[in-house]
């Protein structure tokens, strides 16, 4: 049943109907459309469009429909309705007859879909935050279990300074904490109710929109009807958050792929998140991580698509805005699936502590400690930096680590070097010295883990 047929003398061509209809994807808004309709029915009682008895009858029928939708949402797709709003109204009329035709009084599909998508986005924010927090908890648990796993830290993918696997885990805890916080901010901004804005100029019925907003669990009503029906900022914002978080997940996945490589051999991924080769029987491929990395472009693409769709639209509603749904549905589903898969990857991750330590001992990652040591002996840092660079070149030529050089060898480059240099060149000293807040010292990492466990409890 179309909601707009009276103006037309010809039926829509099937090709146009197939092109125009959105039920195949906006059926996902069924619960929100029903919730919004219940709220609207209560508002219509207060302006004498519906009696209390009529409202109760409508609410009962809508709640029955809600139960049906929750039990089998896919059944909606068997219908020929144009969109989810048409489907709900048609089913309501089937249940209560002509009374169902009164519900749309004073309401437009423009404000109806606006409230539906906001309700859906609010619900998804809560679900996404649960997944992000769960990933953070797994990262913290992994960190707690790997505090003794010393490994190289990298810049430019070159060994830089020693860190621990725990410190690496906690870096991602911080990234995902910002994603969690952004979701909270987005929720607060989208927590305004557009219902009652009509097609664009507001409704002709003096509904109490603030009361309606509270009935639908919004903080307050939107302030401008034109903006209300054309606003898709919340979709863009969620797509932006999803894109940034996927970038974080992609970096996590890339690190894991490198750490899992035969060349690094820092970690071993579980058989449950890897796959084999149809040709090479020895292969164990990090497909879970590769797919997380690969799906990042898909989510970022949805953000780009939405921005391009919106950029040239005049106020207020335009049918272009129907294109908002498939992108946000797919992007948030993909994001949550990737968050959950990253959590699963951590579940049975094995860290090769001996191998990470062996790698940390190579690459002259204690060179900065030698430079700081020279500074403590009165050598200006810029000079000490140059001296250590020359010392490293010498050590490379000799095939030695800095800690393996003799005092006479050190003194070829600086006379201030004494026997106390060896203590500061040890891995443990390298870690212990990084004791400022946020540093890699075991004490600071343990504090960060304890604080995060308390925060996420």
Swiss-Prot record:
Major localisation: cytoplasm
Keyword DNA repair: no
EC number: 4.3.2.1
One Gene Ontology biological process: arginine biosynthetic process via ornithine
UniProt-listed PROSITE patterns: FUMARATE_LYASES (PS00163)
Keywords carried by this UniProt record: Amino-acid biosynthesis, Arginine biosynthesis, Cytoplasm, Lyase
GO molecular function: argininosuccinate lyase activity
Location(s) in or outside the cell: Cytoplasm
Catalytic activity reported: 2-(N(omega)-L-arginino)succinate = fumarate + L-arginine
Isomerase among keywords: no
Entries under InterPro entries matching the protein: Arg_succ_lyase_C (IPR029419), Argininosuccinate_lyase (IPR009049), Fumarase/histidase_N (IPR024083), Fumarate_lyase_CS (IPR020557), Fumarate_lyase_fam (IPR000362), Fumarate_lyase_N (IPR022761), L-Aspartase-like (IPR008948)
Top-rank taxon, per record: Bacteria
Pathway assigned in UniProt: Amino-acid biosynthesis; L-arginine biosynthesis; L-arginine from L-ornithine and carbamoyl phosphate: step 3/3
CC terms in the record's Gene Ontology section: cytosol
Signal peptide: none
Family to which this protein belongs: Belongs to the lyase 1 family. Argininosuccinate lyase subfamily.
PANTHER family: ARGININOSUCCINATE LYASE
Protein name: Argininosuccinate lyase
Protein's organism: Haemophilus influenzae (strain 86-028NP)
């Amino acid at each position: 049943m179309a909601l707009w047929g009276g103006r037309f003398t010809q039926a829509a061509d099937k090709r146009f109907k197939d092109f125009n209809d959105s039920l195949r994807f906006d059926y996902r808004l069924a619960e929100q459309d029903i919730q919004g309709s219940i709220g609207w029915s209560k508002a219509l009682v207060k302006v004498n469009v519906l009696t209390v008895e009529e409202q109760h009858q409508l609410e009962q029928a809508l709640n029955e429909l809600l139960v049906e939708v929750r039990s089998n949402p896919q059944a909606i797709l068997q219908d020929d309705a144009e969109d989810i709003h048409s489907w709900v109204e048609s089913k309501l009329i089937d249940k209560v007859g002509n009374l169902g035709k009164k519900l749309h009084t004073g309401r437009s599909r423009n404000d109806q879909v606006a409230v539906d998508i906001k309700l859906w986005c609010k619900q998804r924010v809560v679900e996404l935050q649960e997944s992000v927090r769960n990933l953070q908890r797994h990262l913290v648990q992994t960190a707690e279990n790997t505090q003794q796993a010393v490994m190289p830290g990298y810049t430019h993918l070159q060994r830089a300074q020693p860190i621990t696997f725990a410190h690496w885990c906690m870096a991602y805890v911080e990234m995902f904490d910002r994603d969690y916080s952004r979701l909270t901010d987005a929720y607060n901004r989208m927590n305004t109710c557009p219902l009652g804005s009509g097609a664009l100029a507001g409704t002709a019925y003096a509904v109490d929109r603030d009361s309606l907003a509270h009935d639908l669990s919004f903080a307050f009503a939107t302030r401008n009807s034109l903006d209300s029906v054309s606003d898709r900022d919340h979709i863009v914002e969620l797509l932006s958050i999803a894109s940034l978080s996927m970038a974080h997940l992609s970096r996590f996945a890339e690190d894991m792929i490198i750490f899992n490589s035969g060349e690094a051999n820092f970690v071993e991924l579980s058989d449950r998140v890897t796959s084999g080769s149809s040709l090479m029987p020895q292969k164990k491929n990090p497909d879970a991580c590769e797919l997380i990395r690969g799906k990042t472009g898909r989510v970022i693409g949805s953000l780009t698509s939405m921005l391009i769709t919106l950029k040239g639209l005049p106020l207020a509603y335009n049918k272009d805005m129907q294109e908002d749904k498939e992108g946000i549905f797919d992007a948030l589903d993909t994001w949550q699936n990737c968050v959950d898969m990253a959590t699963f990857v951590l579940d049975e991750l094995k860290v090769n502590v001996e191998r990470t330590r062996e790698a940390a001992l190579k690459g002259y990652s204690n060179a900065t400690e030698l430079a700081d040591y020279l500074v403590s002996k009165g050598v200006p840092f810029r000079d000490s930096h140059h001296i250590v660079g020359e010392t490293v070149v010498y050590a490379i030529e000799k095939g030695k680590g800095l800690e393996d050089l003799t005092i006479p060898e050190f003194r070829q480059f600086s006379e201030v070097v004494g026997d106390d240099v060896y203590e500061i060149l040890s891995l443990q000293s390298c870690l212990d010295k990084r004791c400022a807040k946020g540093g890699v010292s075991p004490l600071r990492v343990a504090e960060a883990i304890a604080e995060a466990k308390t925060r996420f409890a």
